[in-house]
């Protein structure tokens, strides 16, 4: 949890926090008020925080949401940090949080998507984190290509995506929704994902971890509006989504840009 012990008016603070719902990423604690977000993002961060050194590196978080991971990255001594997310509400959440967790104003927040990287940030970063974005993109290869071109030669990508458990080079393409998500388009096997990454130029593909999503990591709280994981799974068989697909399984990966070709 990210904690700030500034002494503030708790009633006013809580009103501000609740006006910014839903809080997807967190948790945070400000002046003893805990923002109990839908996702316990510390679980994911613990998996990827030591994937590569951030010390004195130029680092990006693509799909950064409200900045939770950016605030955690500050603890690892990067040279600079840039977050990218086109969402309006999550930027407002970041602007609310930054005075508490980025008091030296080291983080740059850009309201841009991954598709903007090619033109505006070629060969710009030593490390890119792209967590929970790929399966939301209609063209995963173009997304990986944009991430590739935004890295310097020798740069590293840390990627998290939904995956399917299969030895084949295949991807699940949900008919309408996956776990009630309308914007889940391609959910690859690890083998298929590795092939995609190699096709755009990445090498040294490494599996960091594979983890099932559980109610410990994602659940309903008072700080979100609406449903969460328990509502997305089959009531009688939690190994399946409501649509009958396998329940969410996430893979965490690291890979290297070894050349500027492609």
Swiss-Prot record:
EC number: 2.5.1.-
Keyword annotations from UniProtKB, A to Z: Transferase, tRNA processing
Organism lineage: Bacteria, Pseudomonadati, Campylobacterota, Epsilonproteobacteria, Campylobacterales
One of the GO biological process terms: tRNA wobble uridine modification
Family (UniProt): Belongs to the class I-like SAM-binding methyltransferase superfamily. CmoB family.
Species name: Helicobacter acinonychis (strain Sheeba)
Subunit and partners: Homotetramer.
UniProt keyword Metal-binding present: no
Catalytic reaction list: carboxy-S-adenosyl-L-methionine + 5-hydroxyuridine(34) in tRNA = 5-carboxymethoxyuridine(34) in tRNA + S-adenosyl-L-homocysteine + H(+)
Family matches, as InterPro entries: CmoB, Mo5U34_MeTrfas-like, SAM-dependent_MTases_sf
Protein name: tRNA U34 carboxymethyltransferase
Recorded GO MF terms: transferase activity, transferring alkyl or aryl (other than methyl) groups
């Amino acid at each position: 949890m990210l904690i700030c012990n500034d002494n503030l008016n708790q009633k006013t603070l809580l009103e501000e926090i609740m006006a910014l719902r839903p809080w997807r990423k967190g948790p945070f604690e400000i002046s003893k008020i805990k923002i109990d977000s839908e996702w316990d993002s510390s679980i994911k961060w613990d998996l990827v925080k030591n994937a590569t050194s951030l010390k004195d590196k130029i680092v990006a978080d693509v799909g950064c949401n409200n900045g939770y991971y950016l605030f955690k990255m500050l603890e690892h001594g990067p040279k600079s940090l840039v977050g990218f997310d086109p969402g309006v509400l999550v930027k407002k959440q970041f602007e609310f949080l930054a005075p508490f967790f980025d008091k030296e104003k080291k983080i740059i927040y850009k309201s841009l998507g991954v598709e903007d990287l090619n033109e505006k940030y070629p060969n710009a970063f030593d490390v890119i984190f792209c967590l929970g974005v790929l399966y939301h993109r209609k063209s995963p290869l173009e997304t990986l290509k944009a991430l590739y071109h935004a890295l310097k030669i020798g740069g590293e990508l840390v990627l998290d995506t939904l995956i399917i458990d299969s030895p084949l080079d295949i991807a699940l393409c949900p008919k309408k929704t996956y776990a009630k998500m309308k914007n889940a388009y391609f959910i690859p096997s690890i083998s298929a994902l590795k092939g995609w990454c190699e096709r755009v130029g990445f090498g040294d593909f490494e599996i960091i971890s594979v983890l099932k999503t559980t109610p410990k990591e994602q659940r309903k709280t008072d700080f979100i509006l609406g449903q969460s994981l328990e509502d997305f799974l089959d009531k009688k068989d939690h190994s399946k989504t409501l649509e009958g697909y396998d329940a969410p399984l996430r893979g965490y990966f690291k890979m290297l840009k070894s050349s500027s070709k492609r």
